Structure formats: structure tokens, C-alpha cells
Swiss-Prot record:
Keyword Chloroplast: yes
GO MF, any single term: DNA binding
EC identifiers of the protein: 2.7.7.6
Subunit structure: In plastids the minimal PEP RNA polymerase catalytic core is composed of four subunits: alpha, beta, beta', and beta''. When a (nuclear-encoded) sigma factor is associated with the core the holoenzyme is formed, which can initiate transcription.
Similarity-based family: Belongs to the RNA polymerase beta chain family.
Lineage of origin: Eukaryota, Viridiplantae, Streptophyta, Embryophyta, Tracheophyta
Protein name: DNA-directed RNA polymerase subunit beta
Alphabetized UniProt keyword annotations: Chloroplast, DNA-directed RNA polymerase, Nucleotidyltransferase, Plastid, Transcription, Transferase
InterPro entries: DNA-dir_RNA_pol_bsu_ext_1_sf, DNA-dir_RNA_pol_su2, DNA-dir_RNAP_su2_dom, DNA-dir_RNAP_su2_hyb_sf, RNA_pol_bsu_bac, RNA_pol_bsu_CS, RNA_pol_bsu_protrusion, RNA_pol_Rpb2_2
Protein species of origin: Pelargonium hortorum (Common geranium)
Enzyme class, UniProt record, top EC level: transferase
GO BP terms in the entry: DNA-templated transcription
Annotated function: DNA-dependent RNA polymerase catalyzes the transcription of DNA into RNA using the four ribonucleoside triphosphates as substrates.
GO CC field: chloroplast; DNA-directed RNA polymerase complex; mitochondrion
Amino acid sequence: MLGDRNEGMATIPALNQIQFEGFCRFLDQGLIEELSQFPKGNSFLEYFRDEEIDFQLFSKTYHLVKPLIKERDARYESLTYSSKLYVSAGFLWKDKRPQKKTICIGNLPLMNSVGTFIVNGISRVVINQILQSPGIYYGSELDYQGFTVYIATIISDWGGRLKLEIDKKERIWARVSRKQKISILVLSSAMGSNLKEILENACYPEIFLALNLKKECGFKEKKYAILELYAKYKDFTEYKDSLDFDFLCETLRKTFFSHKCELGRVGRQNINRRLNLDISHKNTFLLPQDILAATNHLIGMKFGMGTLDDMNHLKNKRIRSVADLLQDQFGLALNRLEDAVCDTIGRAIAKDKIPTLRHLATSTPLTTTYESFFKLHPLSHVFDETNPLTHIVHGRKWSFLGPGGLTERTARFRVRDIHPSNYGRICPIDTSEGIKVGLIGYLATHARIGDCGSLESPFYEMSEKSKRVRMLSLSSRKEEYYMIGTGNSLALNQGIQEEQIIPARYRQEFLTIAWEEVHFRSVFPFQYFSIGVSLIPFLEHNDATRALMSSNMQRQAVPLSRSEKCIVGTGFEGQVALDSGIPLITEHAGKIISTHTDKILLSVNGETLSSPLVLFQRSNKNTWIHQTPQVSRGNCTKKGQILADGAATVGGELALGKNVLVGYMPWEGYNFEDAVLISERLVYEDIYTSFHIRKCEIKIFMTMKGPEKITNQIPHIDPHLLRNLDKNGVVILGSWVEAGDILVGKLTPELVELSPEKRLIEALFDAPIGTTRQSCLKLPIWGRGRVIDVRWIHKGSASRSNPERIRVYILQKRKIKVGDKVAGRHGNKGIVSKILPIQDMPYLQDGRPLDMVFNPLGVPSRMNVGQIFECSLGLAGGLLDRHYRIAPFDERYEEEASRKLVFSELYEASKQTGNPWVFEPEYPGKSIIFDGRTGDPFEQPVIVGQSYILKLIHQVDDKIHGRSTGPYSRVTQQPVKGRARRGGQRVGEMEVWALQGLGVAHILEEILTYKSDHLTTRNQIFGTLLLGGALPKPEPEDRPESFRLLVRELRSLSLELNYFLVSKNKKNFNFWKMNRVEV
């Protein structure tokens, strides 16, 4: 991104470039770096000194072979898309002839063209992690007496922390654990320094001399210093003299020094920069010189010299991308390989055999390490394939969580909050909602990962000597030294720039300075935001929280059966669609020979190239991935031209929703509190119809009585449920199946105790008597569909640990219905509450009925006025047959620029169509509409227009649930909650209040007691409901189980709860006769 020849022009970088660059950096640098450090511990010569054995891997001679299977086949057959890694190795044993050979050390998963890895047929992506950069940081805090304590925190490459602190008595301590601390002189002595060196190099020797005179802080010899350090670190006080000194040194090296003092290359650079040291970058461990320099700087802080560090500044963070994570796993695999080689050599020596290179190296460590990493590591996610937007966004995700990072419960508000150094690098809007807010987010559109894991953002350099504009990428550390002009400078008149006063950023502050003082200016208005936020038109008119919701909900939009481009967009839709990999793009210029449903044939320089199409492929979110040709026979194509559109793309642009006619007005309470009223037209014309592909799977095990059998002969099963099975017992391709139908017929052998007669028959005829039970695969309750694919997956020979699998894929066609969730691009979301006939919907003055009716009260309180601008501009675009692409913050050109644009387009639409109601000067943007039921006009004008509305993946077919029978909680004996556990509907406080308000005391009693946690009564109710009659009344001693639980909890607090029964005679109450009953 440096030195673009096109002056003043900037192109948006590839949105998945970060993943590609990270994986290439791992192949070019990470692999060689880890191989060059093999073995990491003692060499094999030290392991086997008597045998003179050595084993080496040569780092610069590795190579990857071409994968045996294609990416498409790996996904279909549930395999891993990987390549074999070959490395040159050498083996030496005494005076034997040295062996040198290229060996395979395992399979390395490869990144595909989308930036993901395919592991066992599942696409996975490795997200970025933000950690505190290794180095030293100075801060201060108040002790329990209110005095200021200055602290220097040294963070290692592994995340370990060593704190140096100076208290009010000018005593300097090193905190080796949360509870224990030792004198800085003792730590320096344990690291190899003597008192003379310390005093000669100290800036304040008098403080160290005074410190040495104090008994608890005095200098000690190295042996006793190591002993005290070990005692404090391990909290060990007994048998000090009996411990071996060499053992203590080795233990401290492996635990304390390796965890807290290994800085790494980045940590060494940071400490040298902060403390003005000149230590070689190859020395990556903490040295006594570092401790002394850090102490000198800490004392200076005590005397008011120097500045404290901002731990949340982005210059003090580093990004662990896919390159770093894969390199760590490769190093772990090499450690396991080293252990395996040692074991193999040891066994060979015991048997007096000469091992060979072919038997020494095994591929198991590398293969299993990466498989467990992609399956179990918290930063390895299942790739979100809901729509093309998620294909791009997921790889640009970052997280503070994960190994070495923060936790959800302990992260403070200051860490979660927006920092000025984030601008242009981390999106200030797009983050998760809930407990992870601020801990997970997305990179800005132009952000890139630079050297040492820093985030960089591009800027235009403003040169005073020449008019040439050069583009440079600056990290947050370098940016502090320059005046950065904001996006407003883009709109300035080139002739009068010298006279302008513009806003700028300098050292995390916003200033107003003259144009000639600006060093750099922004490249693009969307530079500060993530991709999801960059797709929101009129973003500047929305509240930030609503923009956050919009960004999250766009990733939840399901691809529709017939996609449509938005009328009002931002111009970012094309880049997102192209980089997502969903459309099919030609790599060569040529001529179309023919187009088929499954492939496109292209003639290139006399050769025929076949481009296969993706047809009805299931995504990880059960949405469909499908490509349709956009070219015809005889067309000439250029390189980079789109041959086929995918799901949710039209003409190479992102198309997540539909342009529908909406109005903002209340309608009989059906759009109260974010409910949405829709027209039947959306159902009948399949406007919001989507396809979903569900997967059903069954495993075929090898049991003790033999293998399970797949058959269509299932005893004691209704033949109607078996109607779709073929002769092999598997459902027929193309069958229409309903809930409860058998998809795969399977019989499992059972181990049962036979009667004496059957055992006699077995002995006489020497044939076992088979007893089986049916364990068929049935279609779950989530509905009906069409079987589009059946896969029988074999992975090697079948065994108990490696069963065969049969997968059945079912296509569902879902129309929009009551309970589905819809949303706009401004955080305006709602649930469909009623589907009105077309003739009952409110209609415009030209007779067109509205498609959706939103509640107008949801706009002013939520401050997402951008939807009103989009609605009105969409109406003008629909009438004029125009599409608008509007960049945000257009007020930098003139005041009220958005309003003027919308009104001018409405006025032009009114003139060209001859409809004066489109733009009424008295109430611009509003119109008088009519009630479809009566034909009468409504009293007030209503805002109407065309908005781009999405259908979200939260659909009623996946949510609706009813409980007839199900499990109970063991503690409270109440029904469990949740659809997945067949739970019940929770009746909480507000529901109880509602029933109390209606006065339904008996129904309330039944819900809370008889049908809930009355153990005996709820069993009797079932028979009563079947046979009729009055509900049984519980006995006085039969109390609800939740009440018993409350009593037991009170007893645990030493509170005894009793109640008394008041006896009653025939005539009146006798309050003096009471029977005490313990609960």
C-alpha cells in the first residue's frame, strides 16, 4: 500500500487479505523458524551421550506436495484438505555411515481461496487475537493507606508478569507471585549481578545503598538469593539446606525464568525502546541490565520524571494472527516429534538395533496436533456461511479472549471501551452484544497487520514542497507524531486549501488547525469502520448502538430464493460480493461454449475449460449455497468477469434482502412494540421465500454381537413410515418426507440372556439366535422437505472407533410467516405479527398497497433516522428506476446534504411520474394514504417509501416448541427449560402477576404446584385428564418440592422453618388447640 502511482487515488484492499498474508507468512517464515530450533531442549547428543546419536531436521529444504484431493471433494467426503510436509533429515550413530533422507513429518492443513481450512469436511477459520504486547509498562496505584505506589510490569512473550514496585519508604520489591515479593537486590543477585555492578550502573546509587542496609532488603550471595527466590516463588520454607542447588537452578529456569523472563523478539524491541537500551535482538531473555534499567526508570517515576504508560493504547497491543497461532502449534508438534524420536531411539538401543530415518520420524504428532487445534482451540471457529457477508467478516474478527488473554468476567470497562488509537484500525461500532461487548470486534476496512503484530492504517501524506500525494501505512505508535486530518478535508476546494481551518487528530486529541499544518489525511470515509457498518446507508444519522445492531443483523440475513439489489446502498456491496468467493469469476478471457446447470464451458486459446457450479450445497448455518449462470452461449468474457451469481448476490453485488413498500403508522395495535404487519403478497409471490438444507446423520457401529445392519425390513414399524426406503434400507433420492418418517432403517444386535430352550437350539444347530432392536434414523420434528442428497461415508475400514456414516440432506422451502424476524439496515427489527390480505392493507394514492407497516414510535426514541432517509430515497429510486450509492458523512460537503438530496430526488420523481403526492411541499416525504378495509383516507399523512428489508435466520420454525412430556430437574423437580432439552414454558414473576390480575386462582395453583413439582399429585393428574373427574387434592403433608428445597436452604443458614395447623371444631375455631408440625 506504499507509493501508489495514481495520485490521490486509493483502492480498497482485498477484504480477506489478512488471512492470506498470515498463512503465507507462516509458510515463508514460521515453518523455517521452528524447524531451525529443532530440537528445542537438549540436543540428541546430550540425550544419548554414550551412544553418540544425533538427529536433525534441515529447515531450508522443506517442501509441500500437491494435495491428493480437491477442495470440493474434501468437503463432500468429510476429509481434511491438507498437504504432506517433507523435510530433509539427518541421522548419525557413532561411526556408522550418516543417513540423510527426505522424510514426511505429517499433513499440514491448507488454506483455501476463501481464507478458511477444511477439516473433516467442515470449514473452519482462525480469528485474530489481541494481546498485551511483551515489554515493560509503568503505572501507579494507591495502596490501602492511600499512598501512591509506582509499579513497573514486565510482560513476557508467554504472558507471564513480573512486577517491580517502589513503596513510600523507597523500598524496591519484585513481586514473584500474587502474595510473595522479594527485594530487587535479591532478584538481581539471583540473575547473576553483584553489588558493585549495580552501584556502578545505578542512576541513584544512594537508594540502593540505603536499601542494602535494611535487613529485609539487603544484598545476598547468588546461592542464597536463588534459595530465597525459590522459597518465595514456590512458597517453600522447610528443608532449605537439604535441597540440591543445581536442582533449584533447573527448577527456576523451567518455571520462573522461562515463564516470566522470556521476552521474545517483540518484547526485546519494546524494552530497548522504552528504556533506551542497546541490547541485541537475538538476546530474547530478561537480563540483569534490564532489571537495573527498569529500576532506575521506576525511581525516576517516583521523583516525577517520565510518563506513565497507557496499557490500552493500541501501540501496547499486538495481533496474533493465523500465522502466529499455526507457528505455535507447529512448534508444539515438533516437541512431540522430539519425544517420539527419543522413545524410538531408546527402544532401538534396548534391542541393540540400528534405527533408520524411515522409522524414526512419524506423521502422527503433526497431524494430531493440528486436528486438535482446529477442533478444540477457542480461536478456531466453525466458519459462518450464513450469507456472503459472513464469509468476509468472520476472517476479520478479533478477540481479547483465548489463551493468554482476558476472560469475560474479569475484563474491566476500560479494556472494553473505545480508545482513540483504534481509529482506522478497529471498528468503534461493530462488536458483540451482551457479556462479550468490547472483547470481540472487527477490524476496520483498510486495516492491515504490519511488522511485530501491529495494526496499520493508510493515510495520504501531505507534502509542502510538491503537490504529489503519497499513501503510507502508519501504526498507532508512528501516528502519534503527526497531525492527521479527518475526512472533512476530502471535500475542500483544491484552490483555497491554504486558507482552510480543518479538524485534525494529534496525540489522541481533536484539534482545529490550518491546512498547511496537516501531515496526513484520511483515505476513505469508511476507513474507520468495519465491513458490516460500511454497508449501512446514511450511517451518520443513526445512533451507534443501532448501527451495531444493524451490523450484527446483516450477518444473520438468510439468502432468498430470488435476490434483489438494494436501491439505496453505499457502494461497498460489490467489493464484499467479489471477495466473498460466492460468485463464479473467470480467470481467463475467452468465449462461452455452453452453459449447463452444473458447469460452464469456456473456450480459451483453443482449449476448453470447465467451470463447475455449486448446486444446493448446505452451509454451516443450514442455509443454501447455489450458483446460477449469468452468461449465455456465444458471449465473450474478460478476465475477472462474473460467470455465475451465488446466493444473495445479483450482478456481482451483495443482495441480502428485498426492496419493499413500507409505511410508518400504527395499525390496530398489530405493530405495537416492534411487531410488523405484512401483506399476503410477500407470501404468495415468494418475495421472502428462502431455502434451507438440513442434515440428518446416523452411524453404523461394530458391536460385540456383530455389525449393525442397514435394511428396509424393520419389524413392528408402520409400513407407511417405511414407504420412502429403497431395497438397501436408505431413503430414495428425491423423496418427499414428513416428520417421523424413517430415513435409514437400521437394526442393532442386542446382548440378551436366552432361555434354556433357545440355548439348547444354539448348541444343537451351532448357530446363534439373533435378537435385534430397531435404531432407525427418523426425520425430527423440525418439519418436512425433499431429499436432495444421500452420502455413505467410509473412512478406512469400519471399526468401533471408526464407524461408517450415512448422511441425508433435506431441502426445505420456507415462506415468511407469523413469528419470523425481519430487520432493516438501521437496527429496526421486528417480528411478523399478522399477515393481512392485500385488499386490507393501506394503499397509496396510485392504488399500490403497502407491503409492510412499521411502528413510527420506534424511530425517534432509538435515534435511527437513517431509515427515514433510505425509505424516502428508495421511493424516488423505485419511481425513477435508479440505484443510489451514497458514502457516509455527506454533510462534509454542505449542511443538510442528505435532506437536500432526498427532497430533490422526490421532487424529480414527482415531476417525471406526474404524481404530486410523491412530494408535497406542506409535508415533504409524507403522503395521504387510504385504509384498505374502508377506503377512507387516514387523518394524518404517513411516511411511505421503499426500504431494503432482510429476513433473518431467527425463524419461527426453528423456535416454536411445545412440551407434552419431558424431563424434570433433579433439584427442584420442576420441568427443565430449553427447546433442545424438551423443556417447558417458564412461568415467571410477570406471568404470575398477569394471572393474578385476572383472578384465576385455581389455574395459578395448578400451574405452580400440581402440574409442576407436586410429586404425587402430578402423577395422578394424568389419569384424571384421560378419564375425567375432579383434580386430586394433595395431602397436607405433601408439599411442593421447591418449598422443601427452600426449607433445606434455610436450614443450611441455621434457620428452622415450622408451621402450625389450627384445629377446627364443629361450631367455631378454637385458636388454643394447635398441632406443631415440622416441615
